Each structure stands twice: as structure tokens, then as C-alpha cells.
Swiss-Prot record:
Heterodimer of a common alpha chain and a unique beta chain which confers biological specificity to thyrotropin, lutropin, follitropin and gonadotropin. The gene is Lhb. Glycans are attached at residue 33. Promotes spermatogenesis and ovulation by stimulating the testes and ovaries to synthesize steroids. It comes from Mus musculus. This is Lutropin subunit beta.
Amino acid sequence: MERLQGLLLWLLLSPSVVWASRGPLRPLCRPVNATLAAENEFCPVCITFTTSICAGYCPSMVRVLPAALPPVPQPVCTYRELAFASVRLPGCPPGVDPIVSFPVALSCRCGPCRLSSSDCGGPRTQPMACDLPHLPGLLLL
């Protein structure tokens, strides 16, 4: 009987040991490449470009008794260090600024969501798309 209990315990624990040795099941917060769209209502086309954004899993906690205590702030994957780059929208009429600037993630961290610099709305059901005709490629400055 003792041997059977030991075998059962080994069977229950062995998958978790294998999973733990491979690291987390979800990728942790880090810079990843993403394709974004840029447009201006006064310019005739929309362009797509690739930049790095912060994405990934941040450990979080949910209270067991949510009604008794205030909610726990949930951390999000956000910028630690960033730089800015720019693209030029082609075909803009004179007097319209054709330059669109965007952040480039250099490093990321888990922390509170700052609405001034981040979109904290969660995953999108539809990717960002252009309203104007799309011009493939990019023109980095």
C-alpha cells in the first residue's frame, strides 16, 4: 500500500516538475515585435510599420473575498525604457505634417497601468487596421 501511495504521488508530481523545469507556461513581460498602422485624415494613404512593444504575462492576484476588501491593483506589462522613432506618411498635401512618431520598447517591466502612456484595455478582438487605403512598407526617418 505504501508503495502504491508513493507511485501515485510520483505520478501526480512528475508533470509539474517537467513543466517547472521548462519555465513559465506564458511568456513573461518583454519587448516583442508588432506591426502597427499610421494614418492622418489629411493624407491619402495609411502605412504599416514594425516596432517593438511591451507584451507578456505579469503575475497577479485576485482576492478570495472581493466584497470584504478593496480590489488589488493588477500589474500590466509596460515600458521600462523607451525611445521614439518616426515614419513619414507619403502624399500629404503642403501644410500637413507627414511625420508620425511612435514609442519603441527597449525594456519592459510589470507595473501599474499609466493611462497617460499605455493602452490598458486588454487584448483586442480585431487588430488595428487602416481606415484609408493601405500602402505596404515603411518610410523610417
